[in-house]
Swiss-Prot record:
This is Methylthioribose-1-phosphate isomerase. GO terms for biological process: L-methionine salvage from methylthioadenosine. Its EC number is 5.3.1.23. Keywords: Amino-acid biosynthesis, Cytoplasm, Isomerase, Methionine biosynthesis, Nucleus. One of its GO terms (molecular function) is S-methyl-5-thioribose-1-phosphate isomerase activity. It catalyses: 5-(methylsulfanyl)-alpha-D-ribose 1-phosphate = 5-(methylsulfanyl)-D-ribulose 1-phosphate. Its main location: cytoplasm.
Amino acid sequence: MVLQAIKYSRGQLEILDQLKLPHAEEYDHIYSSTDAWHAIKEMRTRGAPAIAIVAALALAVELSNMKLPSVAEEVKVFITEKLDYLVTSRPTAVNLADAAGKLQRITESAAASEGADGDSVREAYVSAAEKMLVDDVSDNESIGKHGAEWIMKNTEAGKKGPVSMMTHCNTGSLATAGYGTALGVIRSLHSAGSLKHAFCSETRPYNQGSRLTAFELVHDKIPATLITDSMAAALLRLRGESENIAGIVVGADRVAANGDTANKIGTYSLAILAKHHGVKFLVAAPRTTIDLKTKSGADIVIEERSGKEVTLVKGPRHDGVTLDLGVIETISIAANGIGVWNPAFDVTPAELIDGIITEVGVVEKDSNGVFHLDTVFKAEGSEVKPSTIGGL
């Protein structure tokens, strides 16, 4: 059974507190947009698709449980202000801004309808937010299917048999509404009997790989090994052939129009390693992560976080034998007074990316080495979902 990081029913929302993983599974109630803003900012919930869903549903819960004005315009203004506020919780993630924009347009349309009142505007918003939750899971399953098929058909390792894959950060059920993007590809390979082994990097400094991805892999009984970020090159060189490593698959927080991809810090390094060692480097993300208005990675704003995330580590006490969940300790691991630079993301140039896996297929570069990401939006509503979209 796949992990459930978001529990929702109309008027109620709970999120799995990811700061307490992998040692404790505790859910936090989210009652309002303010609760969601803090949960996103504090990274109790994280992952570009997940934070968009949590933000949308939090406002739906708030609207469902409050006494609203009867005037449609007043409710529209309230929703717009809350959406603008929620977007400030994680500016790098385009999914959040994209979801907010779609919900705002739906709200404006509902408010402008003949006979509209506060209740009808609320219903339009809540129904749209709930649909986003359902659609995200379906899209992730499609991403997994397309990615797995592409890897088996387009890699030397895939032609030999079950493949091994490396991944970075957390892109599974904990980062989405369910199933996952990059980790969803690994799940799909495993379900098809095509996965030999998964390797996940710890993802310093927030350790999403060791805390979250490793947790999901163990939970789903997928054969996997955890490595530190600095071991990736050695893994590809020393065990790439014996493990039949086909490539590295990662998620994305924002994909620019030219294919430049902002993702968790350390992604760029892995792309360089993949190129050097001749394995595929793939980005898995829903179309909502693709931002055609952002021309290149140079236009992406990179969030910088507190240096304490680098110099301090936090977790339950362990005496070398047993784990004491009742005692949470913070440990200093760096010289006192040292300066710290802590960008949360980096940008991987499109030239290092072999394919971008979406819910409608895998986008490849044309003969000139150029991604045409507008093609994935032309596939909107198409009954055919190709495994490859390329050379267009």
